[in-house]
Curated annotation (Swiss-Prot):
Residues 1-27 form the signal peptide. InterPro entries: Cell_wall_metabolism_enzyme, Dup_hybrid_motif, Nucleotide-diphossugar_trans, Peptidase_M23. GO terms for molecular function: metalloendopeptidase activity. This is Uncharacterized protein MT3894. It comes from Mycobacterium tuberculosis (strain CDC 1551 / Oshkosh). CDD domains: M23_peptidase. It comes from the Bacteria. Keywords: Signal.
Length: 407
């Protein structure tokens, strides 16, 4: 079995040697594109014994962020792989480390033939002396990535300007995607809040409408659910939570779903298709839905097999939208205790997942539901190390095409 590792570098001297060392543990060849680096990247590549092929762009070309668009760079790497014809390809960024708790070669050798690509967790390194516990106090910094796939002739890259998956756009023509426990990608970039803010500003200059980020706002995805103009609020919430100052939580109060692993399929805030006034949790069908807070059922709507329950308490409305997986029904005026079960989630159409749209409203409009939960000491994000893949296209097929008219 032959494993080819590939990466693309531009002034990556700070992290490149460690990345190459981590790839050399299990790969037979390492191919690299050096995109006009002016630091010690070229020297590192020349002296690393595991690097077997380097393509260099002319250093005197214009100093654009990348010489060629991301999709063209991926296409070049795929064509380089055609000359190696490996059994498996691993592609990483030059600031990713690969950590393994398994014999990766042995695992790949016994991977079923119908699995053609593998996902594993990526975690972000955090080293911010001013906000040392921002992770996990404000959320996790984990995601699933797909760095491994089988080589086939004719693989092609996605056509977006940026944020294409590393694996080929047509890889699923050859089989299905699996998960790879025991392997982690460690992202060495964006290890402080200031670096994340700079990255958001950079992406917004290139893609102000988030068209290349699956329609997801860059600030909400990189700043723990907060908007770029809410950084001061993020910092204030962090300091409150560090001091243990939380909003009151009723006896019995809990997350609306607590079966693990869960995932956030679609977050709160602006998206390319409009403003999303809640958060969509993906979970297993059959998962119970619980009332976060007590109140009275003030509205029940059913549309296309979905039920929308609104539980009102004082000046707060909490909305739960899901496809029921049981026959239980509430009626208008029912008094609901905090922690009471409201129903169970059914499967959503073509997806193997079920979804809960969770929304919080006050007299002033919609509020960030993740912040609402977290400021009561509840942690709605996926637990560390307990990531789940969301089936279906991304963003996932959600039952909630709700948009806010006023916010």
């Amino acid at each position: 079995m032959r494993i080819l590792a590939m990466t693309r570098a531009h002034n990556a001297g700070r992290t490149l040697a460690a990345t190459l060392d981590s790839l050399a543990v299990f790969s037979d060849d390492i191919y690299v594109i050096d995109d006009r680096s002016t630091d010690d990247t070229a020297e590192i590549l020349a002296n690393h014994p595991a690097v077997t092929n380097v393509v260099r762009a002319r250093p005197d070309l214009p100093p654009t962020p990348w010489l060629i668009p991301e999709s063209a760079g991926l296409e070049l790497l795929y064509r380089m792989a055609d000359f190696c014809r490996p059994d498996w390809v691993m592609m990483v960024d030059a600031d990713w480390l690969v950590e393994t708790d398994i014999d990766l070669r042995a695992v790949l050798a016994r991977t079923p033939d119908d699995i053609v690509a593998l996902m594993c967790p990526m975690v972000s390194r955090w080293d911010d002396p001013e906000y040392p516990d921002l992770i996990p106090v404000m959320g996790t910094a984990e995601a699933l990535r797909g760095p491994l796939w089988r080589w086939y002739p004719g693989l092609r890259a996605g056509g977006k300007l940026m944020h294409n998956p590393h694996w080929p756009a047509n890889i699923t023509d050859h089989g299905r995607i699996g998960q790879l426990p025991g392997v982690r990608l460690v992202h060495s970039g964006w290890s402080t809040l200031a670096e994340r803010i700079l990255r958001v500003e950079h992406y917004l200059r290139l893609d102000p409408d988030y068209r290349f980020n699956f329609g997801v706002a860059y600030d909400r995805s990189l700043l723990f659910g907060y908007a770029l103009d809410e950084v001061d609020l993020l910092k204030a919430d962090y300091r409150r939570r560090i001091r243990g100052e939380f909003d009151p939580l009723e006896p019995g109060g809990r997350l609306p779903i607590d079966r693990e692993p869960r995932a956030i399929g679609r977050g709160y805030g602006p998206h390319a298709g409009g403003f999303h006034p809640g958060v969509d949790f993906a979970t297993d069908p059959g998962t119970p839905v619980y009332a976060v807070a007590s109140g009275a059922v003030s509205a029940i709507d059913e549309v296309d097999g979905l039920v929308s329950l609104t539980i009102a308490r004082c000046e707060l409305d909490v909305v739960y939208v899901f496809r029921p997986g049981d026959e239980g029904r509430l009626v208008l005026g029912d008094r609901i205790a905090a922690g009471a079960q409201l129903g169970t989630i059914g499967a959503q159409g073509e997806s193997a997942d079920g979804y809960l749209h969770f929304e919080v409203r006050t007299q002033d409009g919609h509020v960030n539901p993740v912040r609402y939960l977290a400021n009561m000491g509840l942690r709605p994000w996926p637990p560390p190390g307990r990531l789940r893949a969301v089936s279906g296209s991304y963003p996932p097929a959600t039952p909630c095409t709700i948009t806010a008219e006023d916010r």
